[in-house]
Structures are given as structure tokens and as C-alpha cells.
Amino acid sequence: MRLIDLERLYDYHYWANRRLLEAVSQLTPEQFTQNVAGSYGSIRSTLVHVLSAEWGWLDRCGGPPRGERLKAEDYPTLDSVIETWNRVERDMRAFLTQLTADDLSREIEFSLGSGPTHSIPMSGLLEHAVIHAVHHRGQVSLLMRMLGFAPGNYDLLVFDSQPRETPAARQ
């Protein structure tokens, strides 16, 4: 994947995150932490999982260290999640601007849980982080619908139809 394509993918990713977090802000604190059907139990837990994973992959690729996996109970409010997510977004965008084509092709080793070690080019790992978030945004959207909210549409086609700054204008 070319760096310009990866930057576009992350532009989409953070656009969709902001829209989702705006939708989640409609929830009461109780709804935000309420256990509902889903792989992580609550909207808060799902968001913290995605945030922890993204920061972890950034760390694995050579960005700022995350340390231990983030825990939902350390994020009592949506604002606390947003604060950390804004920091991770800034760090990821800064990291992406420093990458070269050689960096993107560099093999990164990782394991999933206690399983075997795998190796994948950095570009694939960075793509995975976005695809992983898409999956969980869908879960959060479903959970919000179960709670009676309309979370909106986060499709890439919707993003592409929105006017936005060019990469040069952001610098």
C-alpha cells in the first residue's frame, strides 16, 4: 500500500471515529457503561478495546509505547475515552508522516494472545488497525440501535462524498 493511500485510510478512520463518538455522546453515562449483548459487553468496553488495539499496533510499529492493554474501568466517561483517542490520533498521524516506502514493507512480528508469532509488512498491520476498528464501529452502532439511538452512517463512500482538506492543506 502506498503511503498516500494509508493516509487517506486513516483520514477516513478518524472521520468515522469522530462521527461515532458524537453519536455515543447522546447516551447517558449509564447507557455508556451498561452491559448489553456484544463481544465486549458495553459500548465503553468496545471503544476502549479498539483504542487499546490501535495504540498497541502503533507501539508495535515503532510509535509511542502503550504499555499494558487499556482497561475499560480506567475510562469512566466518554470524555476520558475521547481525550486518549485524540492523543493516539495525533501520535498516529505524526507517525504516518515520518514513514517511507521501506518502512511500510518492513516485517513486523506479533502474536495474537498466546498463539504463535506471525510476521506481516507494517503496511498490512496499519491497514488491519483500521479494518479492526470498522468491525467494532459496526458493533457499537448495533448496540446503540438496541438502546434506541440512530448512530449514523460511517461508510467510506459517505466519507468520500464529503468535502475535506487535501493532505497539503493539513500541514
Language-model region placement:
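Short, contiguous alpha-helical
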Residues: 7-71, 112-171
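Helix-adjacent hinge/juxtasegments
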Residues: 64-105
